[in-house]
Amino acid sequence: MANEEVILLDFWPSMFGMRLRIALAEKEIKYEYKQEDLRNKSPLLLQMNPIHKKIPVLIHNGKPICESIIAVEYIEEVWKDKAPSLLPSDPYDRAQARFWADYIDKKLYDFGRKLWATKGEEQEAAKKDFIECLKVLEGALGDRPYFGGESFGFVDIALIGFYSWFYAYETFGNFSTEAECPKFVAWAKRCMQRESVAKSLPDQPKVLEFVKVLRQKFGLE
């Protein structure tokens, strides 16, 4: 597809934006990256995502695709002729991949946020829920190198961005992911060896500093 315009409206610590950075990198799609100031959202963001007014937004030839998981599927469908395939070819396997991506969105984000945004009993409950969620994901991974089997794919893309926040989660939740979920950490390190992932995820200490600023704003520091 020649003369295509692809723009990504994003914010660097967003694990949801990281999904699109990784998917575009895997498909080797050239795009323009536009960093958003979420305290002063651009007219383009408000125009392209008038319903939710949030990032990330993938803009393809002037048309917006909102919600990160939907946008990853869009990337696969539009550039399906470009290797690698991000979704399994089998309909059942595709359905399972979508199930786990949905599970990640509904469970992991909220538990992780509570780890740094709460204190006391609420934080302890969030830590228990967070670790339990990771153990469920470890069970889904099984003994395979990636969630899709031998190849990096849809569920890996949906999940790996959270790993950049783990240092912050562990710091404020006072636990070790490696001690609790070693198989999960081994998977994450395997993913980090991929160029598409390594260049799309910010350093964990940088995310920690960002979260410290957020905690100060919330009066938690």
UniProtKB/Swiss-Prot annotation:
Residues binding glutathione are 14, 41, 55, 67-68
Q: What induces it?
A: By auxin.
- What Pfam family is a match, any one? GST_N
Q: Which GO terms describe its biological process?
A: auxin-activated signaling pathway; glutathione metabolic process
Q: Which InterPro entries match?
A: Glutathione-S-Trfase_C-like, Glutathione-S-Trfase_C_sf, Glutathione_S-Trfase, Glutathione_S-Trfase_N, GST_C, GST_C_Tau, Omega/Tau-like, Thioredoxin-like_sf
- Tissue specificity as recorded in UniProt: Abundant in seedlings and roots. It is also found in the shoot tips, flowers and leaves.
What terms describe the molecular function in GO for this protein?
Answer: glutathione transferase activity
Q: What does this protein do?
A: Conjugation of reduced glutathione to a wide number of exogenous and endogenous hydrophobic electrophiles.
Q: What is this protein called?
A: Probable glutathione S-transferase parC
Q: Give the originating organism.
A: Nicotiana tabacum (Common tobacco)
The primary gene name is PARC
